[in-house]
């Protein structure tokens, strides 16, 4: 089983860390337990040159960091992460009388193909100023261009529910794939859930039943890698990854943010501190009750709008052929019943380990003390995904403390309460358990 994070960025993208280099990406992939990492930003000429200089071919269509460039050894993570060529493209254009703003993830089988596609994209607009270029190009035409240059290219609509920049975004997206991609829609086989939605939310939209669901971090710094990830039960090669994502054969599931932690889960207006359920926002006609400005429509609201076949279910569960999959909207007065598609895959809800340590200790996740505890756990027990998902709670307690071990146990049991995210503000976590409060030294 491989853990893959296919959507990330380089330091050439706007608002990203200077440490987004091949060396640090390799290091943090090992810390996190990520086996396959997207390169991000393949359209940027300087980044492509750096990738060619610092990576070497591995299995067909994959790369790895040259051994002499490895920054440090991590005793519990001795594997060599693989890189797959990836990039995100922002397209802004008019279609059917409206301005559309859509982000798309593209995966390619090699840097040579990235060169050819980038040459064509440079004829459309500027690919030098931002690792995630902004182009005045219809998504339909971008998909056509990618497949013409490389029929094995994977085109995946990115974070499909984000309000401002996605295929289904409330403010500048579409109501269907067909409206966006027209006759090329059959070439779309997978979608990226994004941080503010999880599989049950996507399953509630009948039109998405034919698409594979993948999840990635969209990281803008190395430490944010693996916030979400995709599980692959395949061989290591571009061809096998292609098959898994395009057909589901070898796609084992996803690791998910709790959607309430995402920064666009609920409706609201951050400046005024107003966070609302979809029902409350509808009653207010989408207007902030404090300042009178327009609310940002959240992902939950948008999902409910497109889930046309949903019906009320007093039990608060999603009905499936094999039983009940728990899904409580939590912040909505309505529940949802959906027909779960046959291609559904398992998923696990996770939260970054530094945030759990911080919640247990009453500290900021960016504090020096949290970082020190994090590194100790990694060095003594294993990578972050192993700690979150598999390590014995007793071992975690022995290396750190009882309350940190309790926090991880709460995560595994789903005993987490969220103050939900809205209008660009991430949600905050509260662990629901009888904390064994110890001295935090």
Model-derived features: positions:
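Extended substrate/RNA-proximal surfaces in nucleic-acid metabolism proteins
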Residues: 48-189
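Low-complexity, acidic/Ser/Thr- and charged residue-rich accessory regions of DNA metabolism proteins
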Residues: 343-441
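An N-terminally biased module of ancient metal coordination in phosphate/nucleic-acid-related enzymes
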Residues: 1-91, 96-99, 416-417, 429-431, ...
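Short acidic/histidine-rich active-site segments
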Residues: 210-227
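Histidine/acidic-residue-rich catalytic or RNA/ligand-binding cores of hydrolases
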Residues: 14-17, 48-52, 165-172, 203, ...
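Divalent metal-coordination and catalytic microenvironments
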Residues: 7, 41, 106, 155, ...
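Cys/His-rich short segments
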Residues: 252-336
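Histidine-centered divalent metal-coordination motifs
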Residues: 7-11, 159, 220
């Amino acid at each position: 089983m491989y853990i893959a994070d296919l959507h990330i960025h380089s330091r050439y993208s706007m608002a990203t860390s200077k440490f987004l280099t091949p060396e640090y990406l390799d290091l943090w992939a090992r810390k996190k337990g990520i086996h396959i990492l997207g390169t991000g930003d393949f359209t940027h000429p300087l980044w492509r040159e750096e990738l060619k200089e610092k990576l070497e071919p591995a299995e067909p269509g994959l790369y790895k960091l040259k051994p002499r460039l490895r920054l440090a050894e991590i005793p519990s993570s001795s594997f060599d992460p693989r890189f797959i060529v990836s990039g995100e493209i922002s397209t802004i254009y008019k279609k059917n009388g409206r301005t559309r703003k859509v982000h798309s993830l593209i995966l390619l089988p090699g840097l040579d193909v990235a060169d050819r596609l980038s040459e064509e994209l440079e004829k459309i607009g500027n690919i030098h100023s931002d690792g995630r270029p902004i182009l005045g190009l219809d998504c339909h035409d971008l998909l056509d261009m990618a497949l013409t240059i490389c029929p094995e290219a994977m085109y995946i609509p990115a974070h499909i529910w984000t309000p401002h920049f996605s295929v289904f975004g409330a403010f500048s997206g579409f109501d269907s794939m067909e409206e966006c991609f027209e006759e090329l829609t059959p070439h779309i086989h997978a979608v990226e859930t994004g941080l503010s939605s999880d599989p049950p939310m996507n399953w509630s939209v009948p039109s998405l039943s034919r698409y594979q669901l993948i999840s990635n971090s969209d990281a803008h710094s190395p430490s944010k890698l693996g916030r979400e990830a995709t599980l692959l039960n395949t061989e290591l090669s571009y061809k096998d990854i292609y098959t898994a994502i395009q057909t589901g054969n070898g796609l084992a599931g996803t690791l998910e943010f709790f959607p309430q932690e995402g920064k666009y889960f609920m409706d609201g207006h951050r400046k005024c501190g107003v966070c609302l359920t979809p029902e409350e926002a509808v009653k207010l006609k989408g207007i902030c009750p404090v300042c009178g400005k327009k609310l940002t429509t959240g992902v939950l609201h948008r999902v409910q709008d497109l889930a046309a076949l949903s019906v009320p279910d007093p039990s608060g569960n999603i009905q499936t052929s094999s039983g009940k999959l728990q899904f409580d909207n939590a912040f909505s007065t309505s529940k949802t019943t959906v027909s779960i598609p046959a291609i559904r895959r398992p998923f696990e809800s996770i939260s970054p380990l530094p945030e759990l340590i911080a919640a247990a200790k009453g500290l900021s996740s960016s504090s020096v003390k949290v970082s020190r505890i994090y590194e100790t756990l990694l060095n003594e027990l294993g990578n972050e995904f192993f700690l979150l998902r598999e390590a014995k709670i007793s071992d975690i307690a022995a290396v750190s403390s009882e309350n940190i071990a309790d926090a991880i146990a709460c995560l595994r049991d789903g005993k987490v309460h969220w103050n939900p995210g809205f209008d660009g503000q991430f949600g905050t976590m509260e662990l629901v358990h009888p904390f064994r409060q110890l001295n935090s030294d």
